[in-house]
């Protein structure tokens, strides 16, 4: 598979076309919205099928013959739809703590079962797998330092991977950090003419 080269005018045109399509063509926007919501939430353990996500997006409801469905799964997908709308509306702004916290607010505000702060950094220590994450009192400082370093870098695929890795290691939120990290990757790829990935 050919690697995209941003210095190549054909590749730059392709990335610009993808961004333009996402912003101006409902069909492209709808496809990315549904596919990204499904894939990103599936990675985090959401059990909805793509067809159920598509139905929720298109009609606001899901009919199921498979039995019960968790309210949390529905709320997470609906939250992702809101976060993606917010993402598209902020493409002209540099990445900031406010945008990151707004992603979390969009993702988690519809989940009435969520007992953690919504739109705010974590208040309690958490462990991801066997990895110790940053303590709650250090999160804001660590995120600010990460954003400051990132703002000074030439953004390419490698710097996006580095940013995502550091963001995951900080693990700024009690729940939803992985989904937010993937939203950031998609957003920053679009902002920097890097073909986005879903």
What are these regions (language model features)?
Residues 1-198:
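FIC/Doc superfamily catalytic core
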